[in-house]
Amino acid sequence: MQGSARDFLKPKLVESSQTGVNEFKVILEPLERGFGHTLGNAIRRTLLSSMTGFAVTEVVIDGVMHEFSTIDGVQEDVLDILLNLKEVSVVLNTVETAQVVIDKKGPCEITVADIETNGIDITTFNPDKVIATINDEGHMRMTLKITAGIGYDAAASRTDEASSIGGMQLDASFSPIKRVSFTVDAARVKQKVNLDKLNIMIETNGSVNAEVAIKRVATILQEQLSSFVELELVEEEVSLPTSEDFDPQLLAAVDELELTVRSANCLKAEQIYYIGDLIQKSEQDLLRTPNLGRKSLNEIKEVLTEKGLSLGTNIENWPPVDLMSE
């Protein structure tokens, strides 16, 4: 008789701590022997290749037609400026692409903090990063295109996209994850020895914390492996609940709460699509969501209260099987 997956130990997130500037350590245990390296490799590769983020993908600098130019009154040449722009760490909170402007006269250093948002809801995570240095007679105006994406996108792959006149395409590293490593130590549970403890060290660009990143990776891996699940391994035939078994209020889309755009986008980024998904989250869960602050949390609580609902509610057998298949 084949063993059930239920016989395996289920690991827990036992530690999530910050060890330095944008550096985090996450510990998962206990894991069955060998699963430390199996999950460690999968998590590491997915963190580096498949996380969503934002990057500067195109720049137009007034008076500059190509990247091999120099600019009067500017210390750096254009190639150096482009390299600096690749390291700009920002997040667009309400849109997936936007154009922003930097317009400065010398003498001064141009930094990420000099980006003019023009009403766009944008958060910068390395405002002191120097982009260029201008002398007494220097003047620089540039238009940056910031775009959402996944992983790494070479400029050459965007040759078919419409570019601005004088626009220079940049290789874009969208991932908010800069570095990932892991180690596997021995662990034990009561009399059971030879188990694994997985230690994951993560360095980010500041736009995401480690615990949120791990949860996103787990969701990605779960979705990718879902087609391989063998339903015949389930030991008992269980009658799965359908939408008819739940309060219709719980089946309504989060959009029906008429939240602000920022709050709604934050929830969708965490794959919270239905009110039933939302009310099972605690306040702490929501506050760990990137870009969702106390103001957005209070808004969500107020709207739920008006409907007689509250956060931290446990819904047995959620979600209904027909909702999962949509």
From Swiss-Prot:
DNA-dependent RNA polymerase catalyzes the transcription of DNA into RNA using the four ribonucleoside triphosphates as substrates. Residues 246-326 are annotated as: Alpha C-terminal domain (alpha-CTD). Residues 1-232 are annotated as: Alpha N-terminal domain (alpha-NTD). HAMAP family: RNApol_bact_RpoA. NCBIfam families: PRK05182.1-2, PRK05182.2-5, rpoA. The gene is rpoA. Belongs to the RNA polymerase alpha chain family. One of its GO terms (cellular component) is cytoplasm. It catalyses: RNA(n) + a ribonucleoside 5'-triphosphate = RNA(n+1) + diphosphate. The N-terminal domain is essential for RNAP assembly and basal transcription, whereas the C-terminal domain is involved in interaction with transcriptional regulators and with upstream promoter elements. Pfam families: RNA_pol_A_bac (PF01000), RNA_pol_A_CTD (PF03118), RNA_pol_L (PF01193). Homodimer. The RNAP catalytic core consists of 2 alpha, 1 beta, 1 beta' and 1 omega subunit. When a sigma factor is associated with the core the holoenzyme is formed, which can initiate transcription. Keywords: DNA-directed RNA polymerase, Nucleotidyltransferase, Transcription, Transferase. It comes from Vesicomyosocius okutanii subsp. Calyptogena okutanii (strain HA). GO terms for molecular function: DNA binding; DNA-directed RNA polymerase activity; protein dimerization activity. This is DNA-directed RNA polymerase subunit alpha.
